[in-house]
């Protein structure tokens, strides 16, 4: 096992503990609390994958951080903070929408890279909006916290979430997963739109019809799907 992987996990565990203390003292806002909950799941997954105890890792992480802070001068800290770009946290969903439990009548789950896609295949002929909470840096999507698909009535019918055991994903991973989710929902004649905020920071533009640009691979897949649907309809007639 790579030593840097272990030390990174140990430091992340300690920093999560510090952030938890901030929340316990009622000093964190809603996005801060949201990230804390998501990171807790991620740390549990990483701990299981690495075979490391989180409590023990937290103590070692504390020692690493204390050693670094002892060696760090105030001037160096100021320079580091000034040169580090700050990320922003954007929310399409409310805390209630983000934390609400939901279930699927006809569940389908697919893993696309480091992201997990869940779709309720029982949903048909609905207008669906994709909303997401995510962080942005340099005006581009940095990290997806959670994406959910909502009907006009407010029901959750799909979801994209990071896999706790595979931390880290790219903007292309997110766009590919969204393409898979859209394709799965449109298979049952649903009309899917993507929020303008998500379009802007994932694709760099927003369309009035709510549809992001498709990659050549996604276009070919949708064409095959359409041909298959036409053949099924003809056989039914």
Curated annotation (Swiss-Prot):
Stated name of the protein: Non-structural protein 1
Record keywords: Eukaryotic host gene expression shutoff by virus, Host cytoplasm, Host gene expression shutoff by virus, Host mRNA suppression by virus, Host nucleus, Host-virus interaction, Inhibition of host innate immune response by virus, Inhibition of host interferon signaling pathway by virus, Inhibition of host PKR by virus, Inhibition of host pre-mRNA processing by virus, Inhibition of host RIG-I by virus, Inhibition of host RLR pathway by virus, Interferon antiviral system evasion, RNA-binding, Ubl conjugation, Viral immunoevasion
Region named RNA-binding and homodimerization: 1-73
Segments for region (PABPN1-binding): 223-230
Single GO molecular function: RNA binding
Role description: Inhibits post-transcriptional processing of cellular pre-mRNA, by binding and inhibiting two cellular proteins that are required for the 3'-end processing of cellular pre-mRNAs: the 30 kDa cleavage and polyadenylation specificity factor/CPSF4 and the poly(A)-binding protein 2/PABPN1. In turn, unprocessed 3' end pre-mRNAs accumulate in the host nucleus and are no longer exported to the cytoplasm. Cellular protein synthesis is thereby shut off very early after virus infection.
A Gene Ontology term for the protein's cellular component: host cell nucleus
Region (CPSF4-binding), start-end ranges: 180-215
Domain comment, as recorded: The dsRNA-binding region is required for suppression of RNA silencing.
Any single biological process term in GO: symbiont-mediated suppression of host cytoplasmic pattern recognition receptor signaling pathway via inhibition of RIG-I activity
Span list, region Disordered: 205-237
Localization (cell): Host nucleus; Host cytoplasm
Phosphoprotein in keyword set: no
Subunit text: Homodimer. Interacts with host TRIM25 (via coiled coil); this interaction specifically inhibits TRIM25 multimerization and TRIM25-mediated RIGI CARD ubiquitination. Interacts with human EIF2AK2/PKR, CPSF4, IVNS1ABP and PABPN1.
Species for this entry: Influenza A virus (strain A/Qu/7/1970 H3N2)
Motif (Nuclear export signal): 137-146
Segments carrying motif Nuclear localization signal: 34-38
Protein family: Belongs to the influenza A viruses NS1 family.
Biased composition (Basic residues): 217-237
UniProt PTM comment: Upon interferon induction, ISGylated via host HERC5; this results in the impairment of NS1 interaction with RNA targets due to its inability to form homodimers and to interact with host EIF2AK2/PKR.
One family name in Pfam for this protein: Flu_NS1
UniProt lineage: Viruses, Riboviria, Orthornavirae, Negarnaviricota, Polyploviricotina
């Amino acid at each position: 096992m790579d030593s840097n992987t272990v030390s990174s996990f140990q430091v992340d565990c300690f920093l999560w503990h510090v952030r938890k203390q901030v929340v316990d003292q009622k000093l964190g806002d809603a996005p801060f609390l949201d990230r804390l909950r998501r990171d807790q799941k991620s740390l549990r997954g990483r701990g299981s994958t690495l075979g490391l105890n989180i409590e023990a890792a937290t103590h070692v992480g504390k020692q690493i951080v204390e050693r670094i802070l002892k060696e760090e001068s105030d001037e160096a800290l100021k320079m580091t903070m000034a040169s580090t770009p700050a990320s922003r946290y954007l929310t399409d969903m409310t805390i209630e929408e983000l934390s609400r439990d939901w279930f699927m009548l006809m569940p389908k789950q697919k893993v696309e890279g480091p992201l997990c896609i869940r779709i309720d295949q029982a949903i048909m002929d609905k207008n669906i909006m994709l909303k997401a909470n995510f962080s942005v840096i340099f005006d581009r999507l940095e990290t997806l916290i959670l994406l959910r698909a909502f009907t006009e009535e407010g029901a959750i019918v799909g979801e994209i979430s990071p896999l706790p055991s595979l931390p880290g994903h790219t903007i292309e991973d997110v766009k590919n997963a969204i393409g898979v989710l859209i394709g799965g929902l449109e298979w049952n004649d649903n009309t899917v739109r993507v929020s303008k905020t998500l379009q802007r920071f994932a694709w760099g533009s927003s369309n009035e019809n709510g549809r992001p640009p498709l990659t050549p691979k996604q276009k070919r897949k949708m064409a095959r799907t359409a041909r298959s649907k036409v053949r099924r309809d003809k056989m039914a007639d």
